[in-house]
Amino acid sequence: MDASYDGTEVTVVMEEIEEAYCYTSPGPPKKKKKYKIHGEKTKKPRSAYLLYYYDIYLKVQQELPHLPQSEINKKISESWRLLSVAERSYYLEKAKLEKEGLDPNSKLSALTAVVPDIPGFRKILPRSDYIIIPKSSLQEDRSCPQLELCVAQNQMSPKGPPLVSNTAPETVPSHAGMAEQCLAVEALAEEVGALTQSGAVQEIATSEILSQDVLLEDASLEVGESHQPYQTSLVIEETLVNGSPDLPTGSLAVPHPQVGESVSVVTVMRDSSESSSSAPATQFIMLPLPAYSVVENPTSIKLTTTYTRRGHGTCTSPGCSFTYVTRHKPPKCPTCGNFLGGKWIPKEKPAKVKVELASGVSSKGSVVKRNQQPVTTEQNSSKENASKLTLENSEAVSQLLNVAPPREVGEESEWEEVIISDAHVLVKEAPGNCGTAVTKTPVVKSGVQPEVTLGTTDNDSPGADVPTPSEGTSTSSPLPAPKKPTGADLLTPGSRAPELKGRARGKPSLLAAARPMRAILPAPVNVGRGSSMGLPRARQAFSLSDKTPSVRTCGLKPSTLKQLGQPIQQPSGPGEVKLPSGPSNRTSQVKVVEVKPDMFPPYKYSCTVTLDLGLATSRGRGKCKNPSCSYVYTNRHKPRICPSCGVNLAKDRTEKTTKAIEVSSPLPDVLNATEPLSTAQREIQRQSTLQLLRKVLQIPENESELAEVFALIHELNSSRLILSNVSEETVTIEQTSWSNYYESPSTQCLLCSSPLFKGGQNSLAGPQECWLLTASRLQTVTAQVKMCLNPHCLALHSFIDIYTGLFNVGNKLLVSLDLLFAIRNQIKLGEDPRVSINVVLKSVQEQTEKTLTSEELSQLQELLCNGYWAFECLTVRDYNDMICGICGVAPKVEMAQRSEENVLALKSVEFTWPEFLGSNEVNVEDFWATMETEVIEQVAFPASIPITKFDASVIAPFFPPLMRGAVVVNTEKDKNLDVQPVPGSGSALVRLLQEGTCKLDEIGSYSEEKLQHLLRQCGIPFGAEDSKDQLCFSLLALYESVQNGARAIRPPRHFTGGKIYKVCPHQVVCGSKYLVRGESARDHVDLLASSRHWPPVYVVDMATSVALCADLCYPELTNQMWGRNQGCFSSPTEPPVSVSCPELLDQHYTVDMTETEHSIQHPVTKTATRRIVHAGLQPNPGDPSAGHHSLALCPELAPYATILASIVDSKPNGVRQRPIAFDNATHYYLYNRLMDFLTSREIVNRQIHDIVQSCQPGEVVIRDTLYRLGVAQIKTETEEEGEEEEVAAVAE
C-alpha cells in the first residue's frame, strides 16, 4: 500500500496487528467479561443505579478523601436523583443490555457506529475505533522536519477517546460513544492531500479510547506545503508525571494521569523560529483529550470495604496497601502520595506548572478548574518542570488554551497567567485581526456541568457567527444561534473553580460525571477575516494592557482590609477579569462573564483559595460581603440575596420549596422589550416574580430584631432640618425625609443573572405612581420597575428592601413596617383586620391633614389589606413555637372547642365538591402554600383576580408541624346534612357489628325473623307488616346516622360552619379544623385521627357520637385503644363505675422514647388506653351510654373539670370566640392560622418567662424530645472522662 502522499510519513505501531495502515485503540490487558456464552456462569446483571455508582464512586472518593463511606453513598444517591432523563437513559440502556446478557460497552458502541467496515478487513480485528492511513501515500516528500508524537496511557487509565480524522469542519462526530469509525483509504488520501495543499487545519478528534495501551512511536507527522517548511514544537507534561522524560524538540508527549483525572486540550503549534512571513497562519493539529471522568469507567472498578485493626487505617487510594496508626496518621500516603488528610490538616495547594508559548503575543488564558492553580508551560524548561511535579497534583486538572498567530522572528515571547473561576469564557476576535475565538456555551439547566467551547471563527462556514451568552446579550441586536457548532466542547463535570469574590458554595452535585461526552473540534480560520460581535452594554469590554492585574489579593475581606488600613483592589465588575495582552495588533479580546453559583453546583464545599477572615460585626449580625454595600442583617434571618446590592449571601443551596428556573434553549434570545408579553410569558413572569419575592423577602417576626429599622422610620417621619457646613457666606440645610423615587438597586436578575430592563412610561417595566403610607406621611411617589430580559425568567424586580422601613405592595403602595406591626398587634387582641386597617388609615389622615376621596380610600384599604396578609406570609415563622411548653407534643388531656361565629361568607366564594368519592387524605403543605402564594400574588400583581371557586375537599386542618400526624384526613365531603335523626341505639348496633352478629355485607341474605331480632336489639321500632326491604332500610339508616356523626347541624344560610379546635389544659391550640358544612362528630374524629398522638383523654360534649363514629371509621384502631368499651371508662352494657387512671397523674420528667414513632402507645402514659369523655353534669335521657363517658367517673380527672369551667371566662377564649365574617377565603384561613399561633405563642412565652425567672446561675431553658420546656443544669466541674454532663429537670 505504499504510495506518494505529499511527503508526509506516519508510522503507526499496533499491538497484535502487523499491518502499518490501520490504527486502532485497543484496551489494556484485563480480565475479559463473561456473559451468557459457551455455558459460562454469568454475572448478576446490575441495575442502572449500580452502574452509575461504579462509574462515579472512585471519582467521588478521590475528590473527597475525607468523607466516610455513608456520606459518599448519600452524595451519589443525591446526584442520581438529580440526573436528567437523557443522562439516566444512558445507564438504563446499559443495564438493559447487561440484563440481556450482552456486553453493554460493545453493544452501545455498535449502536452508535456510523461508518461501515471496510471490505477486505479481517473480522478478527479488535472491535474499536481505528483510522486507515495509506502507507503508500506516506513515502514521498520527506524533506521537512518531523514531529514525534507519543501518546502513552496508563494501565489504570479508564476509557479514553479514539482518534478519528475529520475531513471538514462540519464533519464532526455527532455521537459521544462511537465504537467504530473508519475512513476509506482512497478518500482519505484525496481529502488529506487537499487539506494539506490548501493550508487548512488537520483535525484529529477524539470520541472514545478504549482502556488499552496506545503508543505512537517514531511517528513523523507533517502539515503544510513543501515550500513553507516549519517545525511544530511544544512539550506539555501533564500532571502526575514522575521523573523527567527525555523528549526531543518537536515531540509531543501526553502521559495520562491516574484514574479520575482530567486531561488537557493539547495544541500542537508551529515553531516560530522556523516560520516565515509567508507561512499560513494558525495551522495546528489539535488532540482534544477529554477528562477521564467524562468517559465511561472500566467495569473492573469495584466498591470494596477494607476492614483494619482497631486504631489503624489504610490508604484510600485503590491498589495501595499502606496502613498506619490512626493516632499518627500522616497527611499523605508515603507509598503512593495520596492525600489522606486529617482533622486539622488542610489539603496542600497543587504545584504550578508553567507554560511558555513559543510564538504569538495574542491573548492567552488558561481556564483553571476548581481546586487548581494556574497552569503554564515553558518550552525550554519542560524537563525541569516535569520533575518537580508531585503526586498531590492528582487532584488538579488543567485546561490549556493556546492561540498562536504568526509574528516576527526573534520577537520576545511572553506568557500570561490568568485565574478564571465560575465563568463563561468568551474570546472575541477584533475585526481585521488574526486570532481565534473561544466561546462558552451557557449551561442552561441548573446542575448541568459547564462546557467550554474552543473554536476558531470562519466567515465562510455556516456557523461562523458565534452568539454571545445569554448573560451578556445586547438587547438591541441579538445574534442568531449557529446552525452547527464550530468549536470543541470540553466538558468538566467533576471540577469547578472557587468563586472570585468569595461567594458561597452550592450543594454538591455529581450529575452523571462518568457519562461519555462528545468533543467538537474547531473549524479552520481564514486569516484577516475574523467575525465581529457587538459587546453588550451589561458588561464592559476588558481593557488590554501590558500589566497583569492581581485577581486575588490576600485572604481578608475588602471590608476588613479597609478597617486595617490596607489598600483595596476591587475588580471592575462582579463578573469581569481584565486579561492583558502584548503590544501586537493581532490580538484577541477575552471577556469573562460570571455564572451564578446556582447554575453549577460544585463538587465540594472546600476550595484552595485562602478563606475569608473578616472582623466581627455586632453579635448575631452579619454584613454584606460587597465592600461598597453597607447592608447589615441578623444571622437568624439572613437573606439569600442582599436586597441592597444583589450579592449572593447564601451558603446552602438546599431549598425544597422552590425550584430553579430551567432554561430549555441553549442560547435564549433576549426578550424584545417593545412588544407586549404573551399569555405564556405572563405566566412565566408570574411564577418567576413569586419565586423572587419568596427568595429575597424574609421578614423577621420579632419587633426587637427590627429596632434599627423602626428608629429609621421614626427619624424619617420626623423630617428634621439639620444645619451643616455653616460659614460666613453659606449655610447648608439638610433635610432627612422619605424619598420621592424608589427602585431596585439590582442591575442583574437575582434569579438567573440576566440583565434587567428599565423602561420608561407605558413600557413593560416603567415607572409607576405609588402611595407612600407612613404614620405621618401620605403622599404619592414614583416606583420604578425592572424586568429580567431572559425570556425564560422575566421576573419583575421592584423596590423590596424592608430594611429601609418600607414594604412594597405591587408598586401601588409603599407602607412602613411599623404600621403593619401595629395591625398585627390589634389582631392579636381579637380585632377584625379590616377594622384595624381602617383605624390606621384614619389616623394617618388626621396626622397628615389629608382627606381622601371614597375611591382613593377604598383603593388604599384593599391594597393595605392584601399587603398585610402577604407581609404575614413572608414573615419567617416557626409554628412549632406555639407548642405548649408543659404538655409538649403529646398532651394527656385535650378539650374540644368550637367557634360557630368565626365564618366565611359565601356571597363571593363558591365551594365545589368532587363528583366521585376519592381519598380522604389531604395535603397540608400544599394547601397552606396555595393560600400563601395567592396573597403574595395579589401583592406582586394587584390586578390579578382572587380565588372565587374553592374545592372544599382539599381544605386542610392546621396543626403545629410536630403535632401533625403522618396522614391528615378531611372527610367532610362524605358528610350528609340531609340525614334525619333515626330512632334506635347506635351503641347496640356498633356492639353487634363488633361481635360479628350483624354483617352489613350479608344483610341481604338475612331472613325477616333475623332482621326483626336485630332491630329489637338495637331498639329500632318496626311494624309487623314491614317488608324485608323496609327492615333492611331501618337498620342501614341507623348505621348511616352513626357514621355521619348523628348531629350534623346545618350552618346559617350563605355562611360556612365555623371551626372546631382542640386545646390542652393550658389553652394552647393543638389543632384546628375549618368547616364548610355543619359540625358533626365526624369532624372531631378527623381531628383526632390527624394528630400525631391521639390523646389519652378527649373531652367533648358529644362524646358518645364521637366514640361510635370512630368505631365505625377506624375499627382496628379503636379495638386497640378501648376494645368494646366504645371510649367509656367501663363497658356500656354494665352500670357505670368509678375507674382510677394513675397514668394520668403528673409523672416525673422522662425522655424515654424507646417506643416507635407510629406505636399506638402514648409516649407519656405508656399505655394504649384512650377515652372519649364529657364534662356534662346533667344526664342525657336520649343517650343511655352518656353516663359511662362522664368525666366524674375518674378521680384523676377531677382537676380538669375546674379547668374546663375556667376556660369560658379566659382571655384567650374571649379572643378566639370573637364573631367575625370574611369575604375573602384566603384571608379567612390565614387569619385563623395566625390567631391560633399568636394566642398560643403568647401563652408559651409566659411559660418560658416563668421558667427563666426561676432559673439559677448556670441553668438554661431547653425543650426535650417531646418539646416540653425544661431546665438544663450544666456541671462546670470536670468529670473523670473530661466530659460535661447535663442533668435536666422539668419545670411545670
From Swiss-Prot:
This is HMG domain-containing protein 3. Residues 42-110 bind DNA. It is found in: Nucleus. Keywords: DNA-binding, Nucleus. The keyword S-adenosyl-L-methionine does not apply. One of its GO terms (cellular component) is nucleus. Residues 363-391, 448-505, 562-588 are annotated as: Disordered. It comes from Homo sapiens. Residues 467-478 have a biased composition (Low complexity). One of its GO terms (molecular function) is DNA binding. It holds the Pfam family CxC4. Residues 370-391, 562-572 have a biased composition (Polar residues).
